[in-house]
A protein has these predicted regions:
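Metal-dependent amide/peptide-bond hydrolase catalytic core
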Residues: 1-123
Length: 123
């Protein structure tokens, strides 16, 4: 959450005020650039719509998770309600042998398109 991120930022900066070695100084620069994705009521509505479509159209279930990483979704979530990670299934992300399961492309794209169509009626 943003509150947790701000708490950690304060704690890290407070460490700089505690000299461990006499005669030394620690300077911390920078700070929070991109915040976490917050689960707002609008985002929950989007999750509900997507989950229902996946269940009704494909007999599947949607599992929500928090990855703790940084994506384009973190950037857009600052301005608009954002769902992330709706693309094809992939394996070994960010490695030399990353791969995707192309069998998931059509159902995932269809679910996204149906969700987008329904959300235009809601928002």
């Amino acid at each position: 959450s943003v509150a947790e991120q701000e708490r950690l930022d304060r704690e890290i900066k407070a460490l700089a005020d505690k000299a461990v070695v006499a005669g030394t100084k620690v300077e911390i620069t920078g700070g929070i650039v991109t915040g976490p994705m917050e689960k707002t009521p609008q985002v929950q509505k989007m999750v509900d719509v997507y989950s229902r479509i996946v269940r009704d159209e494909f007999g599947g279930n949607v599992t929500e998770w928090v990855a703790g990483g940084l994506t384009d979704g973190n950037r857009t979530a600052k301005y608009i309600p954002t769902l992330d990670a709706l693309g094809v299934e992939n394996y070994d992300e960010h490695t030399d042998h990353e791969s995707v399961d192309l069998k998931t492309a059509v159902p995932r794209t269809t679910a996204f398109a149906l969700t987008l169509a329904e959300l235009t009626k809601i928002f």
